[in-house]
Amino acid sequence: MKQLFEGSITKVHGIRVGQAQNDAAKTGVTVVLCSHDGAVMGADVRGAAPGTRETDLCKPENTVERVNAVVLSGGSAYGLDSASGVMRFLEEHGAGVDMGVCKVPIVPAAVLFDLKVGDAHVRPDAAMGYEACEKAGKEVRQGSFGAGAGATVGKLIPGTVPAPSGVGTASITLGCGVTVGAIVAV
């Protein structure tokens, strides 16, 4: 199969990606870390039961214009806890919106339902989110890694066997020199 877009979201200046997972439990987290000044983010929240945290901040009418990281996590609603570890990592590194008394890292998050794939009692948590930050770099493993560790598609139709899916990323550099990147967990 021919790739439509080569590259990854890390081709965008200042973007690094970290992934951590529990292979036995088939769940994990993918973290997109932005440069120290943050980045403008857009989100399209879909699905019959979306699980998100702070994605409303990304709407253009809101006052927060930049995010410091984005979390994609397995574990359904439990996986939102992984964003707390990302916030701790960013706070330790001085990133966030300066509120005068402290900096508050802005970390939108979205989750996948992977509880029926591996061990439903092992979920991405703050420690796994922090670990993903520590592993952040320019290489992004695609497929069943990080948030994609237990990702599947085809679960809505009774009697069908879900198929493995995962994390994917791509980027394109436009003629004007601007690079646009994306990352998804499906």
Task: Indicate residue ranges for each PLM-predicted region.
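Alpha/propeptide regions of enzymes that mature by internal proteolysis
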Residues: M1-V186
